[in-house]
Amino acid sequence: MRDMNDLKSELYDQLLNELPVLRARLGITQEVLALKVGCSRQTVNAVEKRKKEMTWQLFMAIIAVFNLDESTRKMLSDIPGFSEKLNMVLNEEIDR
């Protein structure tokens, strides 16, 4: 069984690699994303530039925003292994 922290780190990296493109697809700024997920624009900027670590709560909030739109939901599902890793982590969290 893979370490859940390693899986989360891989998920964070995969999301961060695509975050500017996902935001562009929705036509939203860092500020708008921040309002939607309940944090500051500075936090989104720092996380996107990898100057600050992403929390699991922020990760899930961002996923929720992009899951609402069909095109960005498809983009997330097209990231190799992303859905599988996310399901593994979520199933582990539920089983605790």
Identify the function of each model-found stretch.
Residues K49:
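Short, conserved catalytic or interaction motifs in soluble domains
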Residues Q57-D78:
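DNA major-groove recognition helix of helix-turn-helix/homeodomain DNA-binding modules
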